[in-house]
Structures are given as C-alpha cells and as structure tokens.
C-alpha cells in the first residue's frame, strides 16, 4: 500500500530565496487539471487555456504557527495562496516516494527527465452523454454487474461560509464515508454519481455543465503519475479527489500525519487505488500496444493533455 502524501510549499514554490523547488515542478509547472470526479465532488476550477484547472493542497501551514487555521494551496492559476483548513473545495493531488514502489508500472512518456507512468486506478473522467444514457438504462433495469469494489468519498455537505461553519457542531462536519459502487459493462468499470445542486453548472470535460440530481457515469481508469527518479517523487498528473476537509481540529502545526485528509488517504484512497487487472496483462505481454489495453483512456488523455501515444515499457 502506498504512503500517499502532499507536496510542501517549498517543494512547489521554493524557499524565500526561490531555491529548492522540485525539478518535477520546474519542468511541469504548478497548474493542474481537475478530473471530472473531483469536480463532481465540489472541486473549484478555472478555465485556463481551454482546460479546467483546479486548486490543490500543499501540506504546509501558512505561518507555521501551532494555532494557525490556514494552509498554503496552489490555486487554479498555479500561484500560491492560503485557505482555512475546513474548506472542502480544494483538491487532492497525491504524491509518494517512488523508490518504495516495487510493483510493475507502465511508462507512457518521457521528456526532460520527467516520466509519465500508469499505476493504480480510480474514477476520473465522465462518460459521454450517449453512452451514459445506455449505462443508466442498464442500471435501472438491474442488469449492470457489481464488481464488489467501492470507492469512498466524504458525504458531508461542503460549507463555504465562515459564519455557517462557526455555528456547526462537531457531528455536522466530521468525515462521513460515502460509498460509490463499482459496476462493470463489457469489461469496463464505472461508478455512478448524481450531480449536487450546490455544484450546478460545473463544467465537465466533455463540455456538459453539471445539473442537479442528474446521474453521471465516471469511468474507472489508470492513474497517471509524473515521476522524477532522481528526486524519488511520483506526483499525480491530475487532481484526483475533492470534498474532504484538510483538518477539523483547531490549529495546524505542520504535523500532516494528524490531519483528516491524510487519514482519508491512508484509510481509503491508498487502498482503493491499488492495481488489479492490467498488471497481469503487462506481465503476460510486455510488447502490447498501449491502445489495446487502454484505448478509451488514451483517447481521453489525448483530448485533455494532447499526449502522444507510445509503446508500453515495463519499468519495474
């Protein structure tokens, strides 16, 4: 199981002398696209250069004070900002120590010493409207197969007003797991999620705007990570989730292990992204064209990031 974490402010922006910024950030930039799943969970997003960029957490307190209520984030424009720990619309962009990963991974691209690899899987991009209608029809008819796997998010309604937040009691805001059932259709896996009125008009990657109570089908797809082997860093290429409070308790002194969002990643996310089916295919056929396994995934990645298709390469 991966020990998922977030980058620090210094990793992303460097120190006061603008030194020590990670090479992976220097070369790939600070802006980050939010997945449709994250947007459906309340992720903020800004349309920049035709892409929906979201804000994402660092693990660094604003001032390093134990009574500090705020954490540094990277906003949708890729600049440093800070926000109180109870807000839920900032997204999670996990990272991990790449040197500790022992399982096989897929390299799909390498440029300027930065690799793009595939490892793990998670609900990410919305299915187009026509196919969504077919899935919804099968769902209502009860003929979609449940795989037995579920993905966990927070069911607590996002509070973005400080006065409302101050009037809540602990039970109103503590993490309350919400399970998203995974279904399979023709060998492809999906989850179903209904649009929230609170996030109405959110722009999705297929051009639709979110409508309240409308069902959306999200495809479970391989996770793309940016890797810098010398720095031993793997960083998710996209914002994977949102809607989870950074820390409920008063004060944050940079002890990231004690935050609500770290506990969420340890207890749920790190377990639910673990690899399954495709690793067996890689071991059996190391020369297979990547399109033969992930045709739809690569198509979507091309649309979102104009990624060039390459051959699979076993890295480990």
For each of these PLM feature ranges, what is it?
Residues 1-316:
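Collagenous Gly-X-Y triple-helix signature in extracellular proteins
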